[in-house]
Amino acid sequence: MDQDRVPFSNTEPFRFCPADGTELEAKGGESRGAACPTCGRSWYRSSAPAVGAAIVDGERVLVTVRGIEPEKGRLDLPGGFVEVGEHPRDALAREAREELGVEVEVEQRPMLLAVHTYGPDGEYVLAMGFRVRIVSGEPNPADDVAKFRWVAADEIDGLDFAWEHDRRIARQALEDG
């Protein structure tokens, strides 16, 4: 898929105005939104924010094997989508509990912000990577994680990451340690 092409129309996911039910019209220009010709409100399809945890233990970082599509069987970092109204740090803690059964502490501000596409339709995602440490529990794969492993800095470049930004986050977390 052409990474520069937006894989949806200006009006998706809205076809009708949520306020009054009028069929929406694509806005012109750069906005890529949809407008209601009756009430004048604008609607936008937004990129989904996601978080990734570079869980560090000394000279190693934890990577997971995806148990589900997209990219099943490939490596990534624990994490996932931020829910509506959820702070990214809270999303990170929730994802670590869901995927590994551990409690984590975020050690710093986001290390990396990256825009990438996710899934077969190429939906855009804004990913935020954080360096974290486990404060309680032992990692145990759950949810969409098939298994995990600890890797050293010299192994990172040879691994099959699903998304390149996860490789950069893992590498930077060990360099910053």
Regions inferred by a protein language model and the residue ranges of each:
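A broadly conserved sequence feature marking short terminus-proximal activation segments
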Residues: 1-13, 112-113, 170-177
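A short Gly-Trp-Pro
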Residues: 57, 78-83, 127-131, 172-175
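Conserved Nudix-box catalytic region and its N-terminal flanking loop in Nudix hydrolases
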Residues: 4-7, 56-98
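Conserved hydrophobic "DFG−1" position in protein kinase catalytic cores
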Residues: 55, 63, 132-134, 150
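NUDIX/MutT-family hydrolases
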Residues: 140-170
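Active-site segment of metal-dependent pyrophosphate-handling enzymes
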Residues: 101-138
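Acidic, metal-coordinating catalytic segment for phosphate/diphosphate chemistry
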Residues: 6-52
